[in-house]
Design a protein with these regions (language model features):
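Short, well-structured N-terminal submotif of metal-dependent ribonuclease cores
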Residues: 1-29, 41-55, 121
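Anion (oxyanion) recognition and catalysis
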Residues: 18, 58, 103
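Histidine- and aromatic-rich ligand-binding microenvironments
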Residues: 26-27, 91-92, 113
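Short, conserved active-site loops that position catalytic residues or coordinate cofactors/metal ions
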Residues: 28-36
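Active-site-proximal, substrate-binding regions of enzyme catalytic domains
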Residues: 35, 39-70
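Active-site neighborhoods of divalent-metal-dependent phosphate/nucleic-acid chemistry enzymes
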Residues: 63-108
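Short Asp/Glu-rich motifs
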Residues: 76, 121-122
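Gly/Pro- and small hydrophobic-enriched strand-loop and loop-to-helix capping segments
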Residues: 110-118
């Protein structure tokens, strides 16, 4: 979401993938991270960034999923397998939860960079 919203070089290809996906899911944690990153990168207030993220979510018909017991368990397992210091993927907390939400819900993980490419979801 951040790459598209802030016009990063990968924005066009990611936007195309969002448009082609059967369903695009996100969690409250990914929304929080996106709001924080958009506010920082675009030098706008959190309220402005939040409104922009909400518009993005509506435009792409993203479906908010809850982080429940299964997602939590998967995130912990992802941390054990792929965290910084243990694996070249170097997943951080937000990455582990994105991984867990995708894996638990049988969804394709839309990402940029090489971190997730080094996991079993690639």
């Amino acid at each position: 979401m951040v790459a598209i919203m802030t016009g990063e070089p990968e924005a066009f290809s990611l936007e195309k993938r969002y448009g082609q996906a059967e369903a695009v899911l996100c969690s409250a944690m990914s929304i929080w991270e996106t709001v924080r990153a958009v506010a920082r990168k675009r030098k706008v207030g959190v309220a402005v960034a939040h409104a922009e993220v909400e518009t993005f979510i509506a435009d792409f018909a993203l479906r908010l999923i809850a982080i429940g017991e299964s997602e939590t368990r998967e995130a912990i397992m992802a941390h054990e397998r792929y965290c910084k210091g243990n694996h070249p993927a170097k997943l951080n907390m937000g990455d582990c939860f994105a991984y867990a939400c995708a894996k638990t819900n049988g969804a394709e993980l839309l990402y940029k960079g090489n971190d997730f490419a080094l996991t079993d979801l690639a």
